[in-house]
Amino acid sequence: MKSLEERLNVMDNELNIFDSLKNTKRVFEPIDSKNVRVYACGPTVYSYAHIGNARMAVVCDILIRVLNTIYPKVTYISNITDIDDKIIQESRKTKISPEELSKKFLNIYNNDMKSIGVKRPNIQPKATHYIKQMINAILELINNGSAYVVDNHVLFNVTSYKYYGHLSKRTVEEQIAGNRIDVAPFKKNSADFVL
């Protein structure tokens, strides 16, 4: 039986993708056909991988393999969230430092993905390596009115971005409907989220 790569090589070197924003299929046109770059949000490494983590990794792996049959170079980047509230909470519970905890579960995650045949991304940047850049971006959002500070939290104001929800084709109200999580009383809008 021929591999996916062998079967794709007999096809014309054109990839059709679904454009969620325009709700239609179209030919994929990379910004740079000599080096196609793909970014995907990776896991928060505080515990073992779950099916949602694996789904994202498998879908991206298939996409990267397809792109590699068409383009000479593909750079795949998937970030690692190695510090956040869940990691800090698990660190306190297990008495393992956040750094050691996230390192442990990143290794387990990468080994788990390898065991199901998923190739590792070319680059896995860690959130802790970009704290200064995140702070600067958040300050810019505060300064332009897209974020606000309340009760020691910084929240993104979803109503400040007129295109919020366009990709999912859901209004802010539709995204809130059926939400089972108690809304923090300090939020201006229940869909606002912590940065």
Go through each PLM region and give its residues.
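NTP-dependent nucleotidyl-transfer catalytic core
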Residues: M1-L195
